C-alpha cells in the first residue's frame, strides 16, 4: 500500500509522471477492480457510473496491441472493424476510454478527498452527488443590490481534438501520457463523433460519457480560469459557501489557483477591472457574469474575455457569443425557470435623538418563475392537454391498470413540483397539477366507459391523495387543520441537491 500511495500522491502528480506508470502497474488494476475497497468510501469506487464489468487487465493489453498494430492491415472500408482486434472496434475503444478516465481521475479525486477532510474539520461523504448544476442554487439566492448589467456567454467549443489534449498540458507533465491520449483520440474518433454543437452545450456519446466529461471539464476549467484569478484579486469575492456546494467545474472540487503564466500576461489588463464585485455561474454550455458598473465597463469585460480565449486557445471566438443585458429589464430562460430581477422594498426606521427617519431600501433579487406557456406546450406534446391547456385523456395508457395509471400521473406531478420547488411563485404549478389530475380522471373514465363526474364521485379522495407532494403529505399529517402552514411553505424557495439534470418537460423546445 505504501508503494501505491507513492504513485497516487496529489502533490506529485504535477511534477512527475503518473499516467504512464499507472497504466502498466499491476497493483493499480487490482486496486481499481477490488470492489471490497468500497468500505473506504472512495469517491472513485462509489461512482454510480462506474462499469462493474470493466477489466483493467484487458485495457492494458489493448493499449499494448494498439501500439503494436500494423496500420497497413486495417481495412478502410469498414470503420467499425479492426483486424488487429478482430472484433468490434467501438467496444474496445469504450473499454480503453473507461480505463483511461478512471486512472486519470485518481489524482484529482484524492485532492478533493483531502480538501473535504480539511474543511472545518469535517469529513464529507457522497460528494460525487454534488454537480455543477448545484452551483446555480446559491447564485439565484444572491443579493444583486449593486449590480446593473449581466453578460450572457456561450462558452466557446473546441474546434479541434488537439485543443482538448493541450488543455491537460498544465496538469499532466508526462509527455508519454499526452501522446497516448492524442493517439487514442485520433485513432478511434473523429471530431464529428466527439462533440456535436447543434444545441447550446455539448452532447456526448452515452457509452463514453465518463471519458469525455473529464476532457470537457478540463477544457471548461481553462475557460473559467480567468474568473478564478479575478476572484482572488478582490476581497469582495471571498465566499464561504464553496465548501458546502462543491461543483464539478474544477475537476470535482473548487481549485482557487491559477497558473503563473496568466498572471504575467494579463497583469496590465487587470487594472481596468479594479474591485469587480462579480457573480458568476455556469449551466450547460452557457454562463452568466453579473457585475456592477456602466455599460462601458461591461463592454471592456466582453472584449477582455474574447481576447483571452482567442490568445489562450488559438481559436476564433466571435463577439456575438457574448451579449450585454441590463439586469433590471431583462428576463432569461434559466434551467427551465423564467428568471428576472425583482425589486423588494425594505423599510428601515432610523432614530437620531428626537428625530426619526424612514429609509426605503430597494433590494434586487432573482425572481424564479415557472414558465406556464412552455410547460403547457410540453404537456400538449405529450398528449396530456391541448395547446390551450384543456386536459384530455391519454388513450395509450388505457390498457394499464388503474393503479399504474394513477401512479404515472402522480409521479409526473410530483417530479414537476420537486424540480420547481425553487420557484418564488407556485401558482402555475397548481394549474399544472389541475391539468394532470383531470387528464388522469379522463383517462380512467375512458377506460371504464364512464363520465368524469361519476368516476370522481366513486373514487373519492383516493385520486386526490396520489397527487400530494412530499411537503404536502408531511404538513397534512403534522398539521391536519392548519392550511395556512402549507401556504407558508410554498411561498419559500426550496432547493434539492438530488436534482442533477433539467427536467424533460421543463426542457421544451
From Swiss-Prot:
Stored InterPro entries: Domain_X (IPR024937), Maturase_MatK (IPR002866), Maturase_MatK_N (IPR024942)
Main localisation: plastid
Record-given protein name: Maturase K
Pfam families cross-referenced by the UniProt entry: Intron_maturas2, MatK_N
Protein's job: Usually encoded in the trnK tRNA gene intron. Probably assists in splicing its own and other chloroplast group II introns.
Keywords from the UniProt entry: Chloroplast, mRNA processing, Plastid, RNA-binding, tRNA processing
GO BP of this protein: mRNA processing; RNA splicing; tRNA processing
Localization per record: Plastid, Chloroplast
GO CC annotation: chloroplast
GO molecular function, one term: RNA binding
Similarity-based family: Belongs to the intron maturase 2 family. MatK subfamily.
Amino acid at each position: 500500500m505504501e508503494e501505491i500511495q507513492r504513485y497516487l500522491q496529489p502533490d506529485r502528480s504535477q511534477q512527475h509522471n503518473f499516467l504512464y506508470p499507472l497504466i502498466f502497474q499491476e497493483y493499480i488494476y487490482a486496486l481499481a477492480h477490488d470492489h471490497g475497497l468500497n468500505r473506504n468510501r472512495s469517491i472513485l469506487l462509489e461512482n454510480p457510473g462506474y462499469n462493474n464489468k470493466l477489466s483493467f487487465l484487458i485495457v492494458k493489453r489493448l493499449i499494448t496491441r494498439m501500439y503494436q498494430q500494423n496500420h497497413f492491415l486495417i481495412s478502410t472500408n469498414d470503420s467499425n472493424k479492426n483486424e488487429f482486434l478482430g472484433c468490434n472496434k467501438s467496444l474496445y475503444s469504450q473499454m480503453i476510454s473507461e480505463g483511461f478516465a478512471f486512472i486519470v481521475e485518481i489524482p484529482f479525486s484524492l485532492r478533493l478527498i483531502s480538501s473535504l477532510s480539511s474543511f472545518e474539520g469535517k469529513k464529507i461523504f457522497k460528494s460525487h452527488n454534488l454537480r455543477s448544476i448545484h452551483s446555480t442554487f446559491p447564485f439565484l439566492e444572491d443579493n444583486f443590490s449593486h449590480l446593473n448589467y449581466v453578460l450572457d456567454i456561450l462558452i466557446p467549443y473546441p474546434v479541434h481534438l488537439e485543443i482538448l489534449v493541450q488543455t491537460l498540458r498544465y496538469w499532466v507533465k508526462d509527455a508519454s501520457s499526452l501522446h497516448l491520449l492524442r493517439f487514442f483520440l485520433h485513432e478511434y474518433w473523429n471530431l464529428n463523433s466527439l462533440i456535436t454543437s447543434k444545441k447550446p452545450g455539448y452532447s456526448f456519446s452515452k457509452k463514453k460519457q465518463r471519458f469525455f466529461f473529464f476532457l470537457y471539464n478540463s477544457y471548461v476549467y481553462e475557460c473559467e480560469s480567468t474568473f478564478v484569478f479575478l476572484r482572488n484579486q478582490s476581497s469582495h469575492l471571498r465566499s464561504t459557501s464553496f465548501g458546502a456546494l462543491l461543483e464539478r467545474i474544477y475537476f470535482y472540487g473548487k481549485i482557487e489557483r491559477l497558473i503563473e503564466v496568466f498572471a504575467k500576461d494579463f497583469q496590465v489588463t487587470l487594472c481596468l477591472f479594479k474591485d469587480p464585485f462579480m457573480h458568476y455561474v455556469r449551466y450547460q454550455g452557457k454562463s452568466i457574469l453579473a457585475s456592477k458598473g456602466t455599460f462601458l465597463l461591461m463592454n471592456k469585460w466582453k472584449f477582455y474575455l474574447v481576447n483571452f480565449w482567442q490568445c489562450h486557445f488559438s481559436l476564433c471566438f466571435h463577439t456575438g457569443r457574448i451579449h450585454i443585458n441590463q439586469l433590471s429589464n431583462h428576463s432569461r430562460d434559466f434551467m427551465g425557470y423564467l428568471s428576472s430581477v425583482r425589486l423588494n422594498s425594505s423599510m428601515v426606521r432610523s432614530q437620531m435623538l428626537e428625530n426619526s427617519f424612514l429609509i426605503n431600501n430597494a433590494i434586487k433579487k432573482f425572481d424564479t418563475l415557472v414558465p406556464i406557456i412552455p410547460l403547457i406546450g410540453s404537456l400538449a406534446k405529450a398528449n396530456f392537454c391541448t395547446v390551450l391547456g384543456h386536459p384530455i385523456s391519454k388513450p395509450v395508457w388505457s390498457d394499464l391498470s388503474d393503479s399504474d395509471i394513477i401512479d404515472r400521473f402522480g409521479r409526473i406531478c410530483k417530479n414537476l413540483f420537486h424540480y420547481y420547488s425553487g420557484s418564488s411563485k407556485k401558482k402555475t404549478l397548481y394549474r399544472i397539477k389541475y391539468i394532470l389530475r383531470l387528464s388522469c380522471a379522463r383517462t380512467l373514465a375512458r377506460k371504464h366507459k364512464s363520465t368524469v363526474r361519476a368516476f370522481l364521485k366513486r373514487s373519492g379522495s383516493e385520486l386526490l391523495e396520489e397527487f400530494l407532494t412530499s411537503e404536502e403529505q408531511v404538513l397534512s399529517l403534522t398539521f391536519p387543520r392548519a392550511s395556512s402552514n402549507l401556504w407558508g411553505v410554498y411561498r419559500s424557495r426550496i432547493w434539492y441537491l438530488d436534482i442533477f439534470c433539467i427536467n424533460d418537460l421543463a426542457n421544451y423546445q
